[in-house]
């Protein structure tokens, strides 16, 4: 739980995305991290409460465009404070997650998405649901939510077995913006209504990171969005 777990990514649409890397858990020296679910919840909390947009870059951009001397510096400071506030909230979110699941969270167990709506509700983020929309219905469901400024949590099923949770916080006519907690990267993924959305994290990503807590994908592990989605309903 540190500032080094948060990364800011800028996409080709000039949008800024806050990506939180999942916690690293080792068992007998081996990486046993299965904390993508809680990391996705942390990202949704950050994005929904507008930590970055309301108190960070938007404010900084407004100050800069007004011609106030030092506007860029002020905007940067606000962005830093926004992330710091998100980090301060993490212990409470971990506690809520533990209370909802009934077991102490340590990041080594697989997440159950049916628990996510209650965790998000207890974070005062409204009413959420975990729904099956099918592989072909995922794009429309995700876009309907992100068009309102509300991110969703998507479930990726790996072709070789296993699964992964990611956050989608923006969608365009033929793409979705995927915030991946494993390597803290943002990926612009091709998508179309009625079609299964493939996800290949091994594809080349343009980004720049100075250190930080993040994982790297190893052998090729392509997959696709299964059709499960956690979204806000009220």
Q: Which residues fall in each region the model found?
A:
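N-terminal carbohydrate-binding/catalytic regions of secreted carbohydrate-active enzymes
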Residues: 35, 39-40, 44-46, 54
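Intrinsically disordered, low-complexity domain-flanking/linker segments in eukaryotic proteins
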Residues: 58, 63-69
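Surface-exposed patches in mature extracellular/periplasmic domains of secreted proteins
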Residues: 51-60, 128-135
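A short glycine/serine-rich beta->alpha loop
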Residues: 11-32
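N-terminal leader/capping segments at the start of a protein or of a new domain
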Residues: 32-37, 60
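Long non-globular sequence segments
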Residues: 18, 48-51
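Mature, Sec-exported extracytoplasmic domains of Gram-positive
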Residues: 28-29, 39, 43, 108
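Conserved active-site-adjacent core of cysteine acyl-enzyme catalytic domains
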Residues: 3-4, 8-10, 14-18, 67-233
């Amino acid at each position: 739980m540190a500032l080094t777990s948060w990364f800011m990514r800028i996409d080709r649409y000039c949008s800024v995305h806050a990506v939180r890397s999942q916690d690293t858990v080792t068992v007998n020296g081996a990486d046993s991290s299965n904390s993508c679910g809680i990391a996705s919840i942390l990202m949704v909390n950050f994005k929904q409460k507008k930590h970055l947009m309301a108190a960070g870059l938007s404010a900084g951009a407004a100050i800069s465009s007004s011609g106030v001397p030092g506007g860029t510096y002020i905007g940067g400071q606000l962005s830093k404070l926004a992330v710091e506030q998100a980090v301060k909230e993490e212990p409470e979110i971990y506690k809520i997650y533990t209370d909802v699941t009934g077991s102490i969270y340590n990041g080594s167990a697989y997440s159950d998405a049916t628990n996510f709506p209650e965790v998000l509700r207890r974070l005062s983020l409204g009413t959420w649901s975990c729904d099956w929309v099918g592989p072909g219905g995922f794009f429309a469901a995700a876009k309907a939510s992100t068009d309102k400024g509300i991110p969703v949590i998507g479930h990726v099923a790996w072709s070789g077995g296993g699964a992964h949770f990611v956050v989608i916080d923006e969608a365009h006519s033929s793409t979705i913006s995927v915030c991946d907690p494993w390597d803290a990267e943002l990926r612009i993924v091709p998508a179309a209504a009625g079609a299964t959305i493939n996800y290949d994290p091994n594809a080349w990503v343009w980004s720049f990171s100075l250190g930080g807590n993040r994982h790297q994908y190893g052998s090729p592990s392509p997959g696709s969005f299964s059709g499960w989605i956690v979204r806000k309903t009220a």
